[in-house]
Amino acid sequence: MSVHEEDQLQDAQLQEDDVVEIVEDDGDIPMDEDDDDNDKYDAEIIIGGPGPGEEDLMMNEEDEGEQRADNSWGVNALHNQQQSIFTISLHPAFPNPPIAISGGEDDAGFIFCPIPADSETSASSSFFSADTFPPTKLTGHTDSVVAAGWSFDGEMVATGGMDGKVIVWQRVKPQESTDEASVDEWKNWSMIQELETGTEIIWLQWHPKGNVIAAGCEDATVWLWNLPSGNTLNVLSSHTMTSTAGLFPPPNGRQLLTASLDSSLILWDPRDPNPVWKSSIFMPANSPELDPAEHGITALAVSPNGQIAAVGGSSGKVKLISMAKGDVLATRLVGHAEGESVEALLFVDLLNGAAGGNKGVVLVSAGTDGKAFVWDVATGRVRAELQHDEPITTLAGHPHPQLHLVTTASADSTLKTWDIRTGALIATHTGHMGVVNGVAIAPAREGKVVVSAGDEGVSLIWKV
């Protein structure tokens, strides 16, 4: 490993969170009933309901079913018809340039512009639109593309497939460029690496500050590569079943946190094949046999200050973990139906760091029971309950100053944007005719653009 590569993965010092108690996981710890000092967001449990202008739409939804009117801003149908799009991600500087990457069941990925033609946005972005920007088809996979994402600076993209490959593409820069992105500057891409793992890719994660990729695999291994060289930094192998999730924890991303169907959560120094710590989250010490359908970890998130991890399980449980040592914390988060898996987790700092610590921090969990819960991290209280008619597949948060907005995607063919402070439904996004597998939120312009990945092979876009 070069000195430059080591610098990208330098170890971080994480401080133990002293707000909540550490306990042994005996399943009998009561929820903390102390009053929450964060009065601004303290309220009784709220079942998500209609927001302004949503009442009529909700009244009509039951009758319309699959015939809901399409209220999207535009549609992109690049993947093969009726073959699922599994993953969607927007450029980190979207809308400059306003491009996205998708991956699907047709063994392909696409770099494309989701902005419809003849729109005000395309005119303000050097005439970027679905008509003027030629999509780039990302080939090379021999099975479904299930993961895709951008490097931290948006100069590279990576796709991960069920064929065991991670393929990396890099932008071919023109000789002359401008501050305002143009079609010519972003239309040319070149494959630079085809990385082999020999087993199905489950998840893929770019480092937030460097050109490093981590990928979790079906055979329980986790791979790390440096780009653009393609050098293997490490192969981590302390899980015993499929690695289901992984991320570089905030605030600096110097460590790697991974989860598995074997119920293990592991913190790594990416340069070291040995774990910093390893914890069994949902597997009781006296359990006779590991059952991934009961004990497996299916979702993972870390708080903005890097002190607490949240893990969701295949049996509907959610637990908080100290990032310092991997201990289960006392706060209980009980709400999802037993036997229904937790599909997505998201920490949101509603005060944007103004209060310090975990004051104002909430956790949003979404599951196959069709519900999303907004939890107060310090007390475990449910602040709001959000509902879909079918399982929720994923969710995404909106950037500052709209941190209070979260958009959920569902098997009921809709996406919904919520104000998680109150549980109010801000908008219902319709147009899909099947399961919505993915959602991406514009990282700029106040997060007012929502882009989806659909089971019927199309991607839709809405303005919030």
Task: Report the location of each language-model feature.
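Loop/turn segments within WD40 beta-propeller blades
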Residues: 89-97, 148-154, 160, 204-211, ...
